[in-house]
């Protein structure tokens, strides 16, 4: 009898754990649906137009469900920024340390970025008639209004600067990038170029990202690498 009764608490704990896991899964599903709905509406209508009711209707949930996960409209915008920004950066910088030697890490990252612009995958630039996921000027307007949104955008930019600086330093160590330039300065310059290119693109000014990238790479290359290219 003692053995039989001892199994009851174990079964109860297992059942409670399964129920908790199911509830957590449901919460994650709801949150993901709300974020994806906001992303779709921001892409279709801009950052300012979609209401919370519209986001909830698109996701198939109530305002009550929204407030379980987000306190304000700013919060869901930040969640969208996290999802889009972190996913994009992971695609550009993933597995760079695992590449073979030869000082090609920066080149590969630049190529991935240029390819993403050409394919329309970069969320802040229009390509070939396909509008950007988010208009850069709307994002900057949101940053001007909201310290929370501004801080998250700054974080993503600084994360990018750090990643690029790491690639520059690795390539310098392998003799592919000039050693007389500071990696963080180069990375900051690269991000300033990207943000400037976003503005030019938003204004409808023509430019060739691949040519810009090639020019920057030549400026950074050692004399030996330039002679070979």
Predicted regions located by residue number:
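Short secondary-structure transition hinges
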Residues: 114-165
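Hydrophobic/aromatic-rich alpha-helical bundle segments in the mid-to-C-terminal region
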Residues: 4, 126-129, 148-154, 158, ...
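Basic, helix-initiating cap at the start of DNA-binding domains
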Residues: 1-45, 49-61, 75
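Alpha-helical DNA-contacting segments of helix-turn-helix folds
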Residues: 70, 77-84
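Amphipathic, non-transmembrane alpha-helical scaffold segments
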Residues: 27, 31, 35, 81, ...
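Helix-turn-helix/winged-helix DNA-binding modules
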Residues: 44-47, 68, 178
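Short hydrophobic/aromatic patch on the recognition helix
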Residues: 59-70
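Hydrophobic alpha-helical connector segments
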Residues: 79, 93-131, 183, 187-190, ...
